[in-house]
Amino acid sequence: FYIRGVDYQPGGSSGISANRDPLSDPDICARDILLFQELGINTIRIYSVNPDLNHDVCMSLLASAGIYLVLDVNSPLPNKHLNRYEPWTSYNIDYLGNVFKVVEQFSYYNNTLGFFAGNEIVNDVTSAKNSPIYVKAVVRDIKMYIEYNSPRPIPVGYSAADDLMYRMPFSEYLECYNENPAESVDFYGVNSYQWCGEQTFYTSGYNILADDYSDYTRPVFFSEYGCNEVLPRRFEEVKSLYSSDMIDVFSGGLVYEFTQEPNNYGLVEVLPSGDVRLLPDFIQLQKQFESLQDLDISSQVASSMRKNVKDMQQRLKTQKSIQPTCQAAYRNIDTSKGVPQSLAEDLIEMGVEVTKGKYVPLTEDQLTSKFKVFEPNG
């Protein structure tokens, strides 16, 4: 499965509250999902939801459009995210209870592709000293909760800042485990903004990224990409990401981001009326995705799968387990205290109380948008 998607959080961090989140308003969902289809994507990433709201219609709309969701379990609201500098103050029952409510509710939608246990939590010296073992603890707790309470297995991963100091050592630490396999991520996302303007596979450094993760035992993809130093963005990296240069290592990616927010990465602008204006970036990305249909992706994927199988067989011959055991230490991050004991055992055993997600029949009205969509020049 190759992810071809966008990051989606209308309103940014203020787009979530007690009353709303990106999947709580069916009218907004219908408007944007029609545009997702025009863009030609198969996956969206959402950074935060409120599990006390109803998401059935929006998730049913996404499913009917053939679109998957990768969902972050944290939110900017109080007690609903890890404090990267003092994680021991936020790793508690209240925090884990909210995480499990998100997981429980969304595990009942079959188009939930995976959960991110964190996003760029390790991004400087202090967070690299204090947070890694707590991120691993949250990964473990979510995976244990899914094992005991979810109707199906769902992968759990992490989304990393593309910081050379921490990217590789932290990915290796999250990949490994000693005794409990739940401490190992199921996938790894990289937020990468290094391809700016006119670049190539080599001048952008994508060749180094592909080389860095060539032996990684978990699926890797871009959880964010799309440098905006040159506007409008041309998205020429799309061809490289889905080419034979990359598909052996990277499973696609998610463009940052759908709606225009203050940081100027938007593909569309939402007008005060709720109508939408497409931005030049939308048209450029659409063209790049359309051009992929001309590439013989299926034969490339088939040959890359054959190569991966051969590599896997070779590795199995040379070592007992392809799953790395944890090292005593990793450069630039502190893992010396070991993974904290879980505070979630009772919650995992009892389960949390939350409305379970379910697909609902959709009416003709729900499948159409009442909003207008304007071209970039009109």
Task: List each model region and its residues.
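Active-site-adjacent "subsite" loops/lids of carbohydrate-active enzymes
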Residues: 77-101
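Noncatalytic carbohydrate-binding groove/subsite architecture in carbohydrate-active enzymes
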Residues: 127-243
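Hydrophobic faces of well-ordered beta-strands that scaffold small-molecule active sites
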Residues: 3-6, 42-46, 69-73, 113-117, ...
